[in-house]
Amino acid sequence: MSLSTAALGIAAPPPSVPLETPAATSTGCLESGDGYLRANLGGAIDATIDWPNSGTRCQGEPKDEPPGVRLSFQRLGGGAPDLLFVFGITGVREGRPARATGVNLTVIVQGTNRIYGTLGDSRCTVDSLAQRPLKARGSYRVEARGFCTQPAHAVRGNDAVLVSTFEFAGLVTYDAQDSDAAPMTSR
């Protein structure tokens, strides 16, 4: 599954010094070592997610409809449950911070047919989002926190998952031609 997310953008970014190279490594989310995903899930999946940089794969790219970004997070080597999170954040623009913007959230239980989605960006919100440029052109460390007020419903069946809170730091590459990261796929 290729990545794409909804956009957030608001004010112009503050001047900043580029960080380390953005390309995710095979052993972690960000080369700088400060990527992560934290989330609280209830319902059909009851879990507290606390994935540090090491062992977490993340990637992100811009999306067109609606404009924004898409970021995904996955633990290398799986886990119980083996989850893939995809955040489509509306209104995000390259290098700009964002506040109070909609999120389309998909949670996939890898190796099964269990897929949960909010089917739009009205059920989850990013409170705040910040971007810092990395050395590779068009690449940014994106840090965000937010919440969902309604659950993501099962694509098949009647189950639902509420991701009550989430926060993450991951990679978005706006210039996909320069990215050497392989697309993340569902198993």
Residue positions per predicted region:
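Bacterial N-terminal signal peptides
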Residues: 1-7
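Small side chains
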Residues: 9, 35-39, 144-146, 170
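An ectodomain-focused feature that recognizes extracytoplasmic/extracellular
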Residues: 12-120
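Generic "edge-of-domain/loop-turn" microfeature
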Residues: 46, 78, 131, 151-153, ...
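Acidic, glycine-rich flexible loop segments
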Residues: 96-172
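Short, low-complexity, Pro/Ser/Thr/Gly-rich segments in the mature regions of secreted, periplasmic
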Residues: 169-187
